[in-house]
Amino acid sequence: MKKNKWLFIVALSTIMVSACQQDDQQSSPDDSNPSNEQQEQTEDQSAPDDSNQAENEDEPAEEEEEPFDEETMSLPTEYFNEIEEVDGQAIIQNPDNILTFVNHDFLLPSDYEPEDLVIPDVKFSYGHQDIPKSYMREEAAGALEALFAAANEEDIELAAVSGYRSYDRQQELYDQAVSKSGPDQEFVANPGSSEHQSGLAMDVSSASVNYSLVQEYEDTEEGQWLSENAHHFGFIIRYQKDKEDITGYGYEPWHLRYVGEAAIEIYENQLALEEFFDLVKEI
């Protein structure tokens, strides 16, 4: 894939908060995590038919249509947010979209819960538990399994820490943070603005940092491997270093967001998802 070089002039005035505020250790039993997750504590032969094979050889193989065109930087309309303003907020109306664009400006509906949530077959920092944060959407979960398998082959130890989180759970965390630190607290995302609710995000850590979610993870062998390889499996580091003014969130080397094939273009050009959607054309 050829690389493009772009110059961006970005003027966004958003507050910087940590996007991955997960349940602190005194949360309810069905969503607790015993690991030390500092950023979020501020708080699962028959023989071939030769005749059919001959017929199939005469027919061109059907290729699955890929939504993202890297040559034209274009996407079909259905991969863009459909927005409806509700009480002064921009609410996403097509949240099942794999490229759903969630941030401070575009919120998920309060009643949205993905219908295809599954537990990926990967290592978790708290062991295998059937609790909400173990889940991801099915496509993202399969990609996470492939990523973890590739890491394991290179003796890179990864552990999933926190995936899906409901709107109501995010509201609880937000209320707790405001009660503790006041309305100007900068640690817990507002309900609706967390990518975890989409089922497309997973926080990942390793034993080298005691399975905590800390910026020092970028300096570990595991964190570096993740940064350099996640895009091969459809994931991006959603909240990048030196992109805080664009994303509105602090640097989170642990936060993976599944975007499918667009991940390669985003990675190779070091784009934030905000920048990607500024550039990509709607068709």
Locations of the language-model features?
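Positively charged n-region of N-terminal signal peptides that target proteins for export
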Residues: 1-6
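C-terminal motif of bacterial Sec signal peptides marking the signal peptidase cleavage site
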Residues: 16-19
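Extracytoplasmic cell-surface/polysaccharide-interacting catalytic and binding patches
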Residues: 21-161, 168-283
